[in-house]
Amino acid sequence: MVKRVNLALQGGGAHGAFTWGVLDRMLEDDSLEIAAITGTSAGALNGAAFKAGMARDGRTGAKQALDTLWAQMGAVGDLRMANWIAGFDAGPLLNVLKMAAPFSPLEAVSQAISPYSYGPFYRNPLRQVVDRFDFDEVCADTGPELYICATSVQTGKVRVFSGTDISTDAILASACLPNIFQAIEIPDPETGARDAYWDGGYTGNPALFPLFRHDLPDDLIVVNINPLVREDVPKTAHDIQNRVNEISFNSSLLRELRAISFVQRLLAEGTVERGRMKRALVHMI
C-alpha cells in the first residue's frame, strides 16, 4: 500500500545536504509517494531538483538530479558563498578561526560590506547553479506539487511561488540572504511592478499553509535542519548571532505549528465541524 505524504523542507545553507540524504532515502521506499513539497532557500533548491528529476525519470531521475545539484553547489568557487554554504553555523574552518578571535573574519566582512558595493561587477554565485534547472520539468504537471517561499522586502510578507511562477529568480529570491546577496526583483502578478525579495526563511521556513488543501494528504513531514533547542547559552559574539539566526528562522515555522495544534484540538473537541478545516498529522525529521 502506497502512503502519500507532503514535505516541508527548511533552509539552512549546506545543512540542506542533510535534506538531500533524507530525500534520497525516501526515494528508495516504493511505499512512499510525495504529493507536494514546500521549500525555502536550500529547501527550495532541493525541492526544485526533486521535482525536475521526478518529471524527467521518476525516482531514478530525482536521485540523479539531487546528486547533480549538490555536486554543483560544492563546485561554486566564490568567497561570498562561505556564509551561505555554512548555513547558520560557521562550520569546521570558521570554528577554528573563531577560537583565535571573538568573531569570524568572513562574517565580519559580510556584515561590513553591502552586496550593493560591488557595482557593475556584482554577480549572484547561486545563479550559475539555478540556471541549470530545466524549468519545463520544475514546473511540470507531473510529480509532486512544488511551492517556493520568499520574503517581500517592502511588505515583510511571505510570497509563495508555484506552477509556472517558479523561475530562476524565484528560487534565488528564496535563498537571498540580504547581507550576502542583492535583493531579487520579480514582477508582481497583479500590478506588474517589480518587487524586491529576500530569503524566505524570514517569513516561512518553509510556509506550511499551501499544503492545507483537502485534496492533499493529511500527513506532513517537516525536514528540520535548524535546531529548535540548544542546551547551552551562547557566550561568544559568533555563537550569539548564530542562535539569534536560528531563533529568527524557526519563528515562522513554530507559529504555524502552534496554529495547526490549535485547529487539531478544536477538531478533536468537536468545536469545529469535521470537514470544514484540514486534519493534519505533523511529523519531524
Tell where the protein language model's regions lie, with residue ranges.
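Patatin-like phospholipase
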Residues: 1-38, 48-285
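Gly/Ala-rich beta-loop-alpha elbow adjacent to hydrolase catalytic centers
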Residues: 39, 43
